[in-house]
């Protein structure tokens, strides 16, 4: 085969400017932007897996025990109020989406967001009902940058941290 003929490489070349240093730079910029410029924060109440009595078959717990709250800087997206009519009158559901910086939580604060945990925002408690990881850094598979938690306001008496 002649030397001047092009051959298809077996693997694509590694990314030129998208390595570990660039991901660290993005983390540093996001940390500074979220904490020092935007400054929105929530108190995160993680469930204590050690002291909560889970059902052996269903994996659910009637009474949950929580660890001490952790202050977390995040981006808060207010979803608004949804009003529905039920048999007994109107029902209002307040919801918001909390966008957590994944590497800041897992690497620096050793915190893992889970469904069923609670957050305190603006003197109201919200329960995390769904989680998503919608964005990847530079489009690289397995390198998500954000955890989005959809939260619904908890009714009085359902959760009380005091």
Can you annotate each of these PLM segments?
Residues 1-93, 97, 101, 137, ...:
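N-terminal disorder-to-order initiation segments that are Gly/Lys/Arg-biased
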Residues 110-113, 120:
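Short, well-ordered loop/turn sites that connect or cap secondary structure elements
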Residues 102-108:
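Mixed-charge, Lys/Arg-rich low-complexity intrinsically disordered regions
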Residues 84, 113-115:
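Eukaryotic intrinsically disordered and solvent-exposed regulatory patches
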Residues 74-78, 118-141:
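Short beta-strand and beta-hairpin "edge-sheet" elements
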């Amino acid at each position: 085969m002649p030397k001047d003929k092009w051959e298809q490489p077996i693997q694509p070349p590694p990314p030129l400017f998208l390595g570990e240093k660039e991901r660290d730079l993005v983390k540093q910029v996001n940390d500074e932007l979220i904490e020092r410029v935007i400054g929105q924060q929530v108190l995160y109440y993680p469930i204590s897996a050690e002291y909560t009595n889970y059902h052996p078959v269903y994996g659910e717990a009637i009474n949950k025990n929580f660890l001490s709250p952790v202050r977390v800087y995040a981006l808060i997206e207010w979803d608004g109020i949804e009003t529905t009519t039920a048999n007994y009158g109107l029902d209002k559901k307040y919801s918001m989406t909390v966008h957590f910086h994944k590497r800041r939580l897992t690497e620096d604060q050793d915190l893992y967001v889970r469904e069923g945990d609670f957050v305190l925002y603006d003197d109201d408690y919200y329960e995390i009902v769904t989680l998503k990881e919608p964005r990847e850094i530079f489009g690289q598979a397995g390198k998500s940058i954000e955890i989005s938690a959809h939260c619904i306001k908890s009714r009085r008496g359902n959760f009380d941290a005091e």
